[in-house]
Amino acid sequence: MIIRTPHLDYYESLQTQWLVYIISIGDTMYQINQLSFSYEKKEVLKNISITFPNNKITAIIGPNGCGKSTLLSHLYRLLPSKDKITLNQKPLESYKGREFAQLVAVLTQSRDSMIDDFLVKDIVLMGRYPYKQHFGTYSADDVKIA
């Protein structure tokens, strides 16, 4: 599963990010069941239920403040989902760090991102990080694939 929030030229003139892509690869599938979330008293997500099917691209479109980033924060566990989100039919909170990292990668694109300091090969290799052992190096196969 790769989640990315592209900064499109057309929307740059509006100085906002309106579009979120959720790309599901292989058998990885997210399912959300009646997720609600509030920042203090402001309700941002209200009873959201959606399935992001495997091998599909899902676009979430909306203006600033409608909950796109909040939804993503739940999907990659920056905010608690209280068993309202499953990944491959297993509650999101039940995944251990490395196991979750092997299933989900997040790539954001924005002007202030430090991603500009990396080569494409470096970014691709970052996706292999959860498979390395502590203080390990990338295998020859990892480097060849990248």
PLM feature segments, named:
Residues Y30-I32, E43-N47:
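Conserved structural motif at the start of ABC-family nucleotide-binding domains
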Residues F37, N47-F52:
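Conserved A-loop
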Residues K42-E43, R98:
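Short coil-to-beta microelement around the adenine-binding A-loop and adjacent beta1/P-loop entry
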Residues I61-P63:
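The feature captures the beta-strand-to-loop junction immediately N-terminal to the Walker
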Residues L75-Y76:
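Helix-to-loop junction immediately C-terminal to a conserved catalytic motif
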Residues D83-E93, F100:
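Conserved ABC transporter NBD signature motif
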Residues S113-A146:
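ABC-family P-loop ATPase nucleotide-binding domains
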